[in-house]
């Protein structure tokens, strides 16, 4: 085996060791790793630098002069005063060059060992267990968007700390700012003795890039977990009117029935969410489900939130003598045009006199409307179509709407055939216009909860059964069904996956024109009353059942026909 001399450098030693490595059956991978490491060019360069430094230490050169720059300046003064020979001019020009002057200045700095700034001495009473705070300089680039972080003053230490990181904001995208970090400076401005609102103003006025001096939190919280939960809002929310929100500017306003993507539930009181379909990728604060339920429960207990039974009864729910219907009419051999109105009239005949408003009662009335978890619906091949449920206020004329939809595309849409105890007429066919059944069979089906809803009109029973709806869906057609709003809870099942459409007529203010005759004045007055009843009916349904509605359809074309039919 070759023997190395004492003067052999580390580079030669490693090179010789590499050549002497022999593969071992037990350590073949380790030997290959060492051979690869020792063969790297970067390691070879480092070894050469190491040898040069060791050589410098052994030589230990000492500077001949500690002020070469001062000597050069003295020589330059002598040359300027001396005779002007070519050699003297050349030396003067050489000593005046910036590069040589810089070399001499570096020489003096090294000779004088002027390497580091002189730090003040440590105080005598320093705590031995004191740990130096690590300061982090963070530079963020943002346009006109907010920083995406909220701050607060710590009650115990008085420091300004990061309270919340908003998902999708500049701070979140950087990954350099965390909850609990202490903020010391913003763009060189100390913020320790400033109020949080003053600091927010400084941050808002900073455009382009912003530099933060931060002391990291002692225990950094984990990064946000990927949380994608979709919630449908069942109430309107405006953060500007919420005095409990930590930061109104960070709040996310939304309307009832909007779908929200909840991206963070770390805070049990305030969630972070985005509106689905919104181009703004930054999340905002919304009250959590638990917090909103507590708040609504408190308001209901203290009387600031009226319970559903306390709402004023709408005018449309009063008995109306002018409303008439011929339930014998039918829609092209498939559905009775006036069936929905016959149910209403039948209920009025049975109850008699004035009615109470059909508000939710029992456990349903005590439900606190906050959020409803939803999932994006994607129709799968071979899956039955969703059930389309129509509910309407006065003047909606749902039967005409269904007639128009089915007539335009009878291969895709259909309606459920209702049941009745009325005797069959000569032109009617069982299972087409109606399912004609006996009163005993009808009442038995009612007892077994086979009907979605049912009613009595002129001593005859009418009803829409769940089996009739299922029969339409089994044909791979979209079933259109109109029901009273209180029947919606029976249809909200995984089997039907109902899509609920609230249909209401357009209500427009009547132009104030002088009446031509007393008769025209009476007609105009009747129209105004009907418009008010329609508006009250729509408001009542939206107030009590709006959380069950998916979309609202305003019918512009049926306003005048509805008014004329009511007057006839």
Swiss-Prot record:
Compartment list: Apical cell membrane; Cell membrane; Cell junction, Adherens junction
What does the UniProt entry report for the null mutant? Answer: Conditional knockout mice Mpp3 in retina develop late onset retinal degeneration, with sporadic foci of rosette formation in the central part of the retina which is accelerated by exposure to moderate levels of white light. Conditional knockout mice Mpp3 during cortical development result in a gradual loss of the apical complex proteins and a disruption of adherens junctions.
**SMART domains tied to this protein:** GuKc, L27, PDZ, SH3
Principal subcellular localisation of the protein = membrane
Transmembrane domains' residue ranges: none
- Tell me where in this chain the PDZ domain is found: 137-218
What's the domain of life for this entry?
A: Eukaryota
Q: Could you tell me which InterPro entries the record lists for this protein?
A: GK/Ca_channel_bsu, Guanylate_kin-like_dom, Guanylate_kinase_CS, L27_C, L27_dom, L27_dom_sf, MAGUK, MPP3_SH3
- Tell me where in this chain the Guanylate kinase-like domain is found: 385-568
Answer whether the UniProt record assigns the keyword Methyltransferase to this protein.
no
**Under the cellular component aspect of Gene Ontology, which terms does the record hold?**
adherens junction; apical plasma membrane; plasma membrane
Keyword ATP-binding on entry: no
Per UniProt, residues of the L27 domain are 6-60, 61-118
| Matches recorded under CDD domains | GMPK, PDZ_MPP3-MPP4-MPP7-like, SH3_MPP3
Q: List the disulfide bonds.
A: none
Provide the tissue specificity.
Expressed in brain, skeletal muscle, testis, kidney, and lung.
Q: Which UniProt keywords apply?
A: Cell junction, Cell membrane, Membrane, Phosphoprotein, Repeat, SH3 domain
Domain called SH3: residue spans: 226-296
The text of the family note is: Belongs to the MAGUK family.
Q: Note the subunit structure.
A: Interacts with HTR2C; this interaction stabilizes the receptor at the plasma membrane and prevents the desensitization of the HTR2C receptor-mediated calcium response. Interacts with HTR2A. Interacts with HTR4. Interacts (via PDZ domain) with CADM1 (via C-terminus)Interacts (via PDZ domain) with CADM1; this interaction connects CADM1 with DLG1. Interacts (via Guanylate kinase-like domain) with PALS1.
What job does the chain carry out?
A: Participates in cell spreading through the phosphoinositide-3-kinase (PI3K) pathway by connecting CADM1 to DLG1 and the regulatory subunit of phosphoinositide-3-kinase (PI3K). Stabilizes HTR2C at the plasma membrane and prevents its desensitization. May participates in the maintenance of adherens junctions.
Q: What is this protein called?
A: MAGUK p55 subfamily member 3
């Amino acid at each position: 085996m070759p023997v190395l001399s004492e003067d052999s450098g580390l580079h030669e030693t490693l090179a010789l060791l590499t050549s002497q490595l022999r593969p071992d059956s037990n350590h073949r991978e380790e030997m290959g790793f060492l051979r690869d490491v020792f063969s790297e060019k970067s390691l070879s360069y480092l070894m050469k630098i190491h040898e040069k430094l060791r050589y410098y230490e052994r030589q230990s050169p000492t500077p001949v002069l500690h002020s070469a720059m001062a000597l050069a300046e003295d020589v330059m003064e002598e040359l300027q005063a001396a005779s002007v020979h070519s050699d003297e001019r050349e030396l003067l020009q050489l000593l005046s060059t910036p590069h040589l002057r810089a070399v001499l200045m570096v020489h003096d700095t090294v000779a004088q060992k002027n390497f580091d700034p002189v730090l003040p001495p440590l105080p005598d009473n320093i705590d031995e267990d004191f740990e130096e705070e690590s300061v982090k300089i963070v530079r963020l680039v943002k346009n006109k968007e907010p920083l995406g972080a909220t701050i607060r003053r710590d009650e115990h230490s008085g420091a300004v700390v990061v309270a919340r990181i908003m998902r999708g904001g500049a701070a979140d995208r950087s990954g350099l700012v965390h909850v609990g970090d202490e903020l010391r400076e913003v763009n060189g401005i100390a913020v320790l003795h400033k109020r949080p609102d003053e600091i927010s103003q400084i941050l808002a006025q900073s455009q382009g890039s912003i530099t933060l001096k931060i002391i990291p939190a002692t225990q950094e919280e984990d990064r946000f977990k990927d949380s994608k939960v979709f919630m449908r809002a069942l109430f309107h929310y405006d953060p500007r009117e919420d005095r409990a929100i930590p930061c109104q500017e960070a709040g996310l306003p939304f309307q009832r029935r909007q779908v929200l993507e909840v991206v963070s539930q770390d805070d049990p009181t305030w969630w972070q969410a985005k509106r689905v379909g919104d181009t703004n990728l930054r999340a905002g604060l919304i009250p959590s489900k638990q917090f909103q339920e507590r708040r609504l429960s408190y308001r209901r207990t203290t009387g600031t939130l009226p319970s559903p039974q306390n709402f004023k009864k709408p005018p449309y729910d009063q008995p109306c003598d002018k409303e008439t219907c011929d339930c014998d009419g039918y829609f092209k051999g498939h559905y009775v045009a006036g069936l929905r109105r016959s149910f209403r009239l039948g209920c009025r005949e049975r109850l008699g006199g004035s009615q109470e408003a059909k508000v939710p009662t029992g456990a349903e009335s005590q439900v606190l409307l906050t959020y409803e978890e939803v999932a994006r619906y994607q129709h799968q091949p071979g899956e039955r179509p969703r059930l389309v449920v129509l509910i309407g206020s006065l003047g909606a004329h749902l039967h005409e709407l269904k007639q128009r939809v089915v007539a335009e595309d009878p291969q895709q849409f259909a309606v459920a055939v209702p049941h009745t105890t009325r005797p069959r007429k000569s032109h009617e066919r069982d299972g087409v216009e109606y399912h004609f059944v006996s009163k005993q069979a009808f009442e038995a089906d009612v007892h077994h909860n086979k009907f979605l809803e049912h009613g009595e009109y002129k001593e005859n029973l009418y009803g829409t059964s769940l089996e009739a709806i299922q029969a339409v869906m089994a044909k791979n057609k979209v079933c259109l069904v109109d029901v009273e709003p209180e029947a919606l809870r029976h249809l909200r099942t995984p089997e039907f996956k109902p899509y609920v459409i609230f249909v209401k007529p357009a209500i427009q203010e009547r132009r104030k024109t002088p009446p031509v005759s007393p008769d025209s004045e009476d007609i105009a007055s009747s129209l105004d009353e009907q418009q008010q009843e329609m508006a009250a009916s729509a408001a009542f349904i939206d107030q009590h059942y709006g959380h069950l509605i998916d979309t609202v359809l305003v019918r512009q074309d049926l306003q005048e026909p509805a008014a004329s039919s009511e007057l006839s």
